C-alpha cells in the first residue's frame, strides 16, 4: 500500500490529518471513468452489449492473463466503458489446499453473494479524478466507508494507475481513479482484446460519454444518500423535483440530482413517494433487494442515428402513446422559445423519442426496457441541445409507459 499523499503540515493537534484545511488540495472530478457490473457470465454479457448496443470489447482479464478466480471484459463506445466481471470458481467448493489469497477468497464470496442478492447488477461507478488521495481522504474524514485504501497498480509496459474505493448507497461502490501516468488498454492486469470474429456489419451506434447515473433508494433514504455526496465528495444539489411534479394516477417519486463542483459528474437519487399502487422505484427495490443503480444515461450527438441503429440491432425501448406527440406538436406551435427543432418530429415519433425543453434549448431522450429478467437496470439514451435538465416535462409520460410494463409483469 502506498503512503498517503497528504502532507503532515495539515495534521491537527491529535496528529491526524485535518482534511477540512485542504479543500483546495482536493481534486477535480473529470467525469465517469467506467461502470463495473457483476454478472453471472461476463463473456455473454459483453457479447450482448457489443451486438445490441454497439460496443466493442477493448480489454480482457481472465485465466489467460493469470486471473484464476475472476473473468472481466471491458467494452466501450467512444468515452463510455462498461466492465463485466464474473466469478469463475465456487468459493464454497474450493479445496482446502487451494492457493488462493485471503483477498481473492473474500472477493469471491462477496461476488457470489452479490449475484444471489441482486442478480446481474451494477457494482461500481468509477470517477476519474486528478488527485485520488485528496478525494479519498476528504471523503473518509467526512464519514465514507473505506473499501480500498489508495493503491498504485503498475504495468511495466504501460505505466501506473492510482485507485481507491469507497462505499455509497446499498452495495454500490465508487472507485476513484487517476490515469495520468498510464497508456495501457484499461488497467494493469488487463490485455488488449482480440479482434472480433464477426463477419456481419451491423449499423454503428454513435455515443459520446456517460451523462448521468441514477440510484434508487428505499423509502425515506434519498436525503441521507444525497448527504453522502454533499459531505463526502463536495457535490452540490443541481436539480430536484418532488411527488407533486413526478406523479401519475397510481404512483409518484421524489428525485434530487447531486453534481460535482464542475458539474461533470451528476448522480440523480430517487425514492418512492406515497401513491395508490407500487411505483417503479418500489418495484426496483424489491427485485434488486435494496438500493442500487437504476439506470445509466448515455449521451449521444445524434439520437436519431443512435436509436435507429439500436432498434435495428434489437434493443427494446419503452412504448410512447401517439397522444404524447399530439400534445408536443400543439405545445411547439403555441409556446415561446428561442430555438428550432433540428430533428424531424415525424421521425422522433416513429422512434418513440421523448422531448423536453425550455426557452433556451431542448433534450431528446428514450429509455430501454429492463435489461435483465429482474426489472431493475435499464439504459437511457439522451441528446442535449443547450439544455441541462433531466426531462421533468416527460416524467408523467415516462412513468405511465413504465407502469404499463409493470402491469404486464403483475407488479403495479
UniProtKB/Swiss-Prot annotation:
Keywords: Dioxygenase, Iron, Metal-binding, Oxidoreductase, Phenylalanine catabolism, Repeat, Tyrosine catabolism. Gene3D superfamilies: 2,3-Dihydroxybiphenyl 1,2-Dioxygenase, domain 1. Its EC number is 1.13.11.27. It comes from the Eukaryota. InterPro entries: 4OHPhenylPyrv_dOase, 4OHPhenylPyrv_dOase_C, 4OHPhenylPyrv_dOase_N, Glyas_Bleomycin-R_OHBP_Dase, Glyas_Fos-R_dOase_dom, VOC. Its cofactor is Fe cation. Residues 31-179, 209-369 form the VOC domain. Disulfide bonds: none annotated. Belongs to the 4HPPD family. NCBIfam families: 4HPPD. This is 4-hydroxyphenylpyruvate dioxygenase.
Amino acid at each position: 500500500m502506498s503512503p498517503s499523499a497528504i502532507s503532515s503540515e495539515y495534521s491537527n493537534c491529535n496528529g491526524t490529518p485535518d482534511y477540512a484545511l485542504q479543500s483546495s488540495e482536493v481534486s477535480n472530478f473529470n467525469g465517469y471513468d467506467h461502470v463495473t457490473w457483476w454478472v453471472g457470465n461476463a463473456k455473454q454479457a459483453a457479447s450482448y452489449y457489443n451486438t445490441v448496443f454497439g460496443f466493442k470489447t477493448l480489454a480482457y482479464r481472465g485465466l489467460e492473463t493469470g486471473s484464476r478466480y475472476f473473468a472481466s471484459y471491458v467494452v466501450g463506445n467512444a468515452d463510455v466503458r462498461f466492465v463485466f466481471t464474473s466469478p469463475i470458481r465456487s468459493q464454497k467448493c474450493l479445496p482446502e489446499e487451494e492457493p488462493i489469497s485471503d483477498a481473492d477468497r473474500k472477493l469471491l464470496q462477496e461476488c457470489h453473494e452479490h449475484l444471489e442478492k441482486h442478480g446481474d447488477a451494477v457494482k461500481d461507478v468509477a470517477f476519474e479524478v486528478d488527485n485520488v488521495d485528496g478525494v479519498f481522504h476528504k471523503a473518509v474524514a467526512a464519514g465514507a466507508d473505506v473499501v480500498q485504501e489508495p493503491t498504485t497498480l503498475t504495468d511495466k509496459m504501460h505505466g501506473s494507475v492510482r485507485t481507491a474505493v469507497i462505499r455509497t448507497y446499498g452495495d454500490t461502490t465508487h472507485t476513484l481513479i487517476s490515469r495520468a501516468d498510464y497508456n495501457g488498454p484499461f488497467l494493469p492486469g488487463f490485455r488488449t482484446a482480440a479482434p472480433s470474429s464477426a463477419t456481419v456489419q451491423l449499423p454503428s451506434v454513435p455515443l459520446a460519454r456517460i451523462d448521468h447515473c441514477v440510484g434508487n433508494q428505499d423509502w425515506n433514504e434519498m436525503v441521507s444518500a444525497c448527504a453522502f455526496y454533499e459531505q463526502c465528495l463536495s457535490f452540490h444539489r443541481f436539480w430536484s423535483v418532488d411527488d407533486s411534479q413526478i406523479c401519475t394516477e397510481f404512483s409518484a417519486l421524489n428525485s434530487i440530482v447531486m453534481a460535482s463542483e464542475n458539474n461533470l459528474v451528476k448522480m440523480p437519487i430517487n425514492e418512492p413517494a406515497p401513491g395508490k399502487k407500487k411505483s417503479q422505484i418500489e418495484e426496483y427495490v424489491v427485485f434488486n433487494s435494496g438500493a442500487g443503480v437504476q439506470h445509466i444515461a448515455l449521451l449521444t450527438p445524434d439520437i436519431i442515428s443512435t436509436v435507429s441503429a439500436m432498434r435495428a440491432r434489437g434493443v427494446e425501448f419503452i412504448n410512447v402513446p401517439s397522444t404524447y406527440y399530439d400534445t408536443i406538436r400543439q405545445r411547439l406551435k403555441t409556446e415561446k422559445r428561442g430555438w428550432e427543432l433540428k430533428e424531424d418530429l415525424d421521425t422522433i415519433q416513429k422512434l418513440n423519442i421523448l422531448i423536453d425543453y425550455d426557452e433556451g434549448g431542448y433534450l431528446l431522450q428514450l429509455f430501454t426496457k429492463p435489461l435483465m429478467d429482474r426489472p431493475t437496470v435499464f439504459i437511457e439514451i439522451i441528446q442535449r441541445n443547450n439544455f441541462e435538465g433531466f426531462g421533468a416535462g416527460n416524467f408523467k409520460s415516462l412513468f405511465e409507459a413504465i407502469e404499463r410494463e409493470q402491469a404486464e409483469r403483475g407488479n403495479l
